[in-house]
């Protein structure tokens, strides 16, 4: 981006890379309640404010930057978007981010998924109550487990079997 806080906070900026079948974050965001609320209330978002604290400077809708980078009443602003992500869903079998960070030799390997999740929950609870947020994460983890059991593990087993079959 061109070092404009307004541009950096705009979901369209993130969506230039985070799009398509292999990582469709912008498509998911645009169709979500958060994305719809952002488009509806964009003029109330104070996107060019020097500080941008959820619940203080705006409360209409989160953007990618809100959840993954913005300051909260208890967390400083961060440029490390991985500090609030508790799953890495890029591999066939999703892993906790400290596992994938360790394989790549990244400093994030020192930060466990529970800390990252608590960082994100801190963001969420500026707009949602704690029960709602905890319920979301229960469903999210269950969905990861369901995907692994129903698709990823059987798919990997078939792939392994096909490699062993010489015909």
Give the location of each predicted region.
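Primarily the internal scaffold of c-type cytochrome electron-transfer domains
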Residues: 2-167
